[in-house]
């Protein structure tokens, strides 16, 4: 993936996010977060990496590698999935899209080399080609006004379901439009060649989209309760513990790690789960802070943020909690703070936007 826009010339603050250098803040993080919540924000996806999977055996091979079902995936549609160890632990997460003649696998840059090397080891006698889409670039767009903004930019929107894609045009630029699945606001991605993406960016900004940096996107991620691999999902975690049941097919048949996933389902033996915490007293806890209830350690914090609100900020955190301590509304201690357990995504009322 190459740089998608000329943000270096705009005086934005840049830095590392999800394994790649990108724009962190364009002007004001608070305003950018509010654009994602109540308007429309456009952002770089320099931390996104795409791989192309082709060859006669691609369906059978890929279906045996990941936790979701691509054997029955219709052309133009995608799924979210995990890559697991034989012990059922999570090596990484990804999205896979069926383009008919090949699959597109999308991962964060921080995971790309590891997952590419890990999966390639299992191509033995299979007729499968698995390679990076090195000349691709992408941008994202999100918010309640996203579809109106796309149309104002001259991009016709086919009726896409979540994780569905279609080819579109914007002036002379050709692109693939991909509908995302963010829980708080509609979101799309535009994939194209590196040479055409800047024209797409300019068209969306002229149509009213607010340039948004990675810091505001991270706030929106936490507000939506979306776990990130390496932050909220680690190799020691099990798929069902993450709460991302959309990543798992229980009917597809064998894949690496399937035996453990099925055993947990059959026995109902899940001892902890991913949840939200709304801080009611004390400072924002740091990731890694222990969660306690009645003097016992019952979980851990993995992410935390101060969400912008009209009257200040709302402190929240994400993390894992043992089931016996995890009833909604229960009060727990997060380091030096007290918090209420809250289901995800967080409920953000009018005062939060």
Where do the protein language model's features map onto the residues?
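Acidic, low-complexity central loop/insert segments
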Residues: 41, 50, 72-73, 92-227
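Acidic, proline/glycine-enriched N-terminal capping motif
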Residues: 1-80, 84, 89-91
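Glycine-rich, small/acidic residue-mixed loop/short-helix segments
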Residues: 94, 238, 242-258, 262-353
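Anionic-ligand-binding alpha/beta catalytic cores of soluble enzymes and soluble regulatory domains
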Residues: 189-278
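Short acidic-hydrophobic surface loop/beta-edge motif
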Residues: 13-15, 79-84, 161-172, 331-334
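Short amphipathic beta-strand starts and helix->beta connectors
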Residues: 29-38, 81-93, 123-126, 168-178, ...
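Short strand-coil-strand connectors
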Residues: 18, 86-87, 99, 170-173, ...
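Short, surface-exposed ligand-recognition loops at beta-strand->loop->(often short) alpha-helix junctions
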Residues: 52-57, 141-145, 278-286
């Amino acid at each position: 993936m190459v740089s998608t826009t000329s943000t270096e010339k705009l005086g934005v603050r840049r830095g590392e996010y999800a394994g790649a250098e990108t724009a962190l803040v364009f002007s004001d993080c608070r305003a950018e977060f509010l654009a994602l919540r109540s308007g429309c924000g456009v952002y770089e996806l320099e931390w996104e990496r795409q791989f192309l999977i082709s060859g006669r055996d691609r369906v059978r091979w890929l279906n045996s590698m990941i936790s979701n079902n691509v054997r029955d995936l219709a052309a133009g549609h995608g799924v979210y999935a995990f890559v697991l160890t034989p012990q059922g632990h999570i090596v990484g997460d990804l999205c896979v899209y069926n383009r008919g003649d090949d699959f597109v696998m999308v991962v964060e840059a921080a995971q790309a080399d590891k997952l590419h090397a890990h999966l390639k080891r299992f191509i033995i006698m299979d007729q499968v080609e698995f390679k990076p889409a090195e000349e691709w670039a992408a941008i994202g767009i999100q918010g309640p006004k996203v579809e109106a903004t796309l149309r104002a930019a001259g991009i016709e929107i086919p009726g896409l379901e979540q994780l569905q894609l279609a080819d579109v045009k914007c002036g002379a630029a050709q692109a693939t439009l991909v509908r995302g699945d963010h829980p708080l606001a509609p979101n799309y991605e535009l994939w194209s060649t590196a040479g055409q993406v800047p024209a797409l960016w300019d068209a969306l900004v002229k149509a009213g989209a607010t340039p948004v940096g990675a810091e505001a996107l991270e706030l929106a991620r936490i507000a939506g309760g979306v776990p990130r691999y390496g932050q909220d999902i680690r190799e020691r975690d099990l798929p069902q513990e993450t709460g991302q049941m959309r990543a798992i097919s229980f009917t597809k048949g064998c894949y690496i790690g399937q035996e453990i996933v099925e055993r947990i389902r059959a026995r109902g033996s899940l001892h902890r789960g991913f949840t939200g915490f709304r801080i009611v007293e004390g400072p924002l806890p740091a990731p890694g802070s222990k969660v306690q209830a009645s003097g016992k350690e019952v979980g851990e914090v993995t992410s935390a943020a101060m969400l912008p609100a009209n009257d200040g900020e709302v402190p929240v955190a994400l993390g894992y909690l043992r089931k016996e301590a995890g009833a909604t509304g229960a009060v727990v201690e997060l380091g030096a703070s007290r918090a209420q357990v809250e289901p995800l995504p967080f409920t953000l009322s009018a005062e939060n936007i």
